[in-house]
Amino acid sequence: MFKKMIKRISLTSLLLFFLGSVNIYGADAICYNCPPQWADWASQLKMIKKHLGYDIPHDNKNSGQTLSQLLAEKNSPVADVAYYGVSFGIQAGQKGVVEAYKPRNFNEIPDGLKDPQGKWFTIHSGTLGFFVNVDALEGKPTPKSWSDLLKPMYKGMIGYLDPSSAFVGYAGAVAVNRAMGGNLDNFDPGINYFKKLAENDPIVPKQTSYARVLSGEIPILFDYDFNAYRGKYKDKANVVFVIPQEG
């Protein structure tokens, strides 16, 4: 029987380890928030199976849903490992739902990107910007700035994940706020921006929306560069990644 731990992955990416049993799932290990369409988890889980022999099923929770599940299962843990945004990893460590774990080369991770005890650590990072399906714009110019997204021509074409639940949504809200002149102690600029953006009827899903961008359902998504480049170079879609001019 496999010892459970949860180590979480953040957008800087953390891993989290836990104790529990997974026999009811018929799997070797359980990972929360390992969606096949995010950060190429599909390929990663195949490589884990190939090189380590562990069969780990996909899981489509977002960061907030993952933390909620860990808290609900605190006394009877199910997951072995969890992946989520760094802020959720910090909370998980504070709430006592993860065990300390230090993988090989833990000491090489910069101090600001890990918990000293190993309750969370970063495994990758991403640059946030616009993941744009050029064909789905139907001739409209590719937006270059946060301000561009407020133009009426993009009504119904913009999406961002729910900031209250998904880490990438929270990261997007923080990025907008900083670009508009705010900081972590003053979110008014970001709040005012999203009030204006609401006039363009944005789509606000809770789960990763990679496939919805490629299909054209969401032409413009606040997302990370690694998802956009996967669409461009692996799935050969006519997509671009834009870093907003305001930063």
Label the model's feature ranges.
Residues E99-P103, N238-P244:
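Short hydrophobic/aromatic-enriched beta-strand-loop microsegments
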Residues P57-D59, P202-V204, V240-V242:
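General small-molecule cofactor/ligand-binding pocket signal
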Residues A27-Q91:
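Early extracytoplasmic/lumenal segment of secretory-pathway proteins
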Residues S87-G93, L214, P219-N238:
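A ligand-binding cleft/hinge motif common to bilobed small-molecule-binding domains
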Residues M1-L11:
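Bacterial N-terminal signal peptides that target proteins for export
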Residues S21-G26:
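Sec/Tat signal peptide C-region and signal peptidase I cleavage site
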Residues C34-A42, V78-S215:
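Extracytoplasmic ligand-binding site segments that recognize negatively charged/polar headgroups
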Residues L11-L19:
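Hydrophobic helical h-region of N-terminal Sec-dependent signal peptides
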